[in-house]
Swiss-Prot record:
EC number(s) given by UniProt: 2.1.1.172
Similarity comment: family membership: Belongs to the methyltransferase superfamily. RsmC family.
Origin species: Hahella chejuensis (strain KCTC 2396)
Subcellular location: Cytoplasm
Pfam families: MTS, MTS_N
Name of the protein: Ribosomal RNA small subunit methyltransferase C
Role: Specifically methylates the guanine in position 1207 of 16S rRNA in the 30S particle.
Description of how the protein assembles with itself and partners: Monomer.
Amino acid sequence: MSQLSNPSQAFLRQRGQLSGRILLCSPPADAIAAELRQTGVEVSVLSWDHTAVNACRGAVAEEWLFTDLALPADAQWDQIALFMPKARELLDLMLSVVAPALKHAQHIWLVGEKREGVESAAKRLAKEDWDATKVDSARHCQVWSLTPPADWKPKQNDFWRAYELAQEKVDTLQLFTLPGVFSAGRLDEGTEVLLQSLPELHGRRLLDFGCGCGVIGATLKKRYPKASVELTDINLLALKSAARTAEANGVELNVYASDGLAEVQPGVDAIITNPPFHQGVKQDTRVTQQFLRDCARVLKPGGSLTLVANRFLPYPDWIEAHVGPVRVLFENSRFKVYHAVR
């Protein structure tokens, strides 16, 4: 089971109780679906993670993406496994999405790492009159068995957050975010200093990598209305947020899922990004390092990269190794904004 994450390994310890049709909600990006299929169960997947969906393809009967924030009203499974989301506030969203199917399920599981809050989530549900029983602990994870109260209804919450951003040189932006999307409900400091430090950009094709709610992409389109602006993310809730941000501001943005730069076609004139370097509660620079390696393929000769990062991370060495000489456009006690031309 070396290809399985700790939560998946903990869940598979329950294989003696797994049968029939199972819905995996927000599973890790690993081989959990394929492992379950080998036990004879029929697996469906509901996920907002582009990478996890790709990992499950070929091993599932059905898949849904959290794009419409709803399941068919008649959707039914024998068992439902809720994998603890990396952002804790997403659990309420997940429960709201699967609510129509919960009453039909014979068994509901909650699985996750202790440090990602699975125990506190289970105890919170218990305070809301759920029957929550811890059935296993392994691999620094816990597995809980859940039963909702007979009169349970999902929280009435449209889950959208909105805020405005006033900037120089462009109109005030209306920004929309869903739970778990980076910089949800407010502009983070890193993106703020990046936008304030942007150099003059050249070319017709601009890319916002790891777009979150779309604030960078929308700003670029306002500043360069003739440019084609692309926004990518692996979080499908981020893409939904960015699409709504585009609509609210009357701008046309090309928003699509991409695992790093894998789905981005070559010929980009400029990449502007506050790149992701956290996976759940762990710091992880692998995504950014792979992104920088791929920049040479995606950027045109003479194309540029503008990037904000925590100042303690060794971005200059990585950027120079894969893109070109680095200039520091801005720095303070927390962040640096780097610019390089291929």
